Amino acid sequence: MKVWLLLGLLLVHEALEDVTGQHLPKNKRPKEPGENRIKPTNKKVKPKIPKIKDRDSADSTPKTQSIMMQVLDKGRFQKPAATLSLLAGQSVELRCKGSRIGWSYPAYLDTFKDSRISVKQNERYGQLTLVNSTSADTGEFSCWGQLCSGYICRKDETKTGSTYIFFTEKGELFVPSPSYFDVVYLNPDRQAVVPCRVTVLSAKVTLHREFPAKEIPANGTDIVYDMKRGFVYLQPHSEHQGVVYCRAEAGGRSQISVKYQLLYVAVPSGPPSTTILASSNKVKSGDDVSVLCTVLGEPDVEVEFTWIFPGQKDERPVTIQDTWRLIHRGLGHTTRLSQSVITVEDFETIDAGYYICTAQNLQGQTTVATTVEFS
């Protein structure tokens, strides 16, 4: 038994010597205990970075949804293009999806309360219909959804629709004007528009000065042409004033518009520049007195006057007269002179005190006062 045990130990010993005597391959080294045995590779792998959608940026700007459709023959519908060209006499039906729809269309149709246009609100859409169209109806038609809380509504900017329609009429290249001569005021602090709009989309339109006779180029810097508005003076100044007209050419025909008198405004926009002056600040009993309130402003800006005077509570009879006229202040500068005068006859003690005038326009109001004493 011992012999077999010794023989087995001898064989194991020889086997271990054979293993330890083997040579390692070139460029190989023995693995350390616990070393990663995964075969290394030279392949480069580009890490993938997951794309994260920026929800805040996407949600901050709501998408605008066009809600307008044009009704065609036989009940067909289509989304109207930004501009449409139709023949005068054709009917137009536009629909906008929504239970509360607001509409805007050329002011010409509203000014004369034209029965050719009708606006209706149905359960699911608003409807605008225009029949027997004319070239004067050329303009923008737009709609929008309304967000209402009770009787108070506001425009939903995300649900709108619009189209500009040219109504082409034989012999009419320009949208008709109610007069043969219009005035355009040139304000130094805002754009001015010569409103010669055409009824044919493809018409070539140029601007001309009457004297000295020459074409005024729309160079895109001082003057640009907008088919929806006309010729736009971006930065008006006094050199632009004078008489101008437009010329349109289309289909081998040409036409001249009405004439426009361009007047430069010397007074910039703002609340009324107001002064007050009494005919006398000391008045004897039984005499008459007048107090004058004067405003110099833009030619096309109306001014409203209101008065507060000492005898008002006692219903003292007075006379108030408002007038205005255009005046030229040299170098072609034109301003509007607006005046209001309050007259008190047979002056009494209750008429003594402060006479207060308030002048108001679209930009604001100005209040001035003066005193009239009893002497």
UniProtKB/Swiss-Prot annotation:
Bias class Basic residues marks the residues at 40-50
- Every Ig-like C2-type domain range: 62-159, 272-375
Which Pfam family is one of those matched by this entry? VEGFR-1-like_Ig-like
Keyword GTP-binding belongs to the record? no
| Region ranges (Disordered) | 22-64
> In this UniProt entry, which cysteines form S-S bonds?
96-143, 293-357
The family database entries (PROSITE patterns) matched by this protein are listed as:
IG_LIKE (PS50835)
Swiss-Prot/TrEMBL keywords: Disulfide bond, Glycoprotein, Immunoglobulin domain, Repeat, Secreted, Signal
Write the protein's name. Answer: Platelet-derived growth factor receptor-like protein
Organism of this sequence: Macaca fascicularis
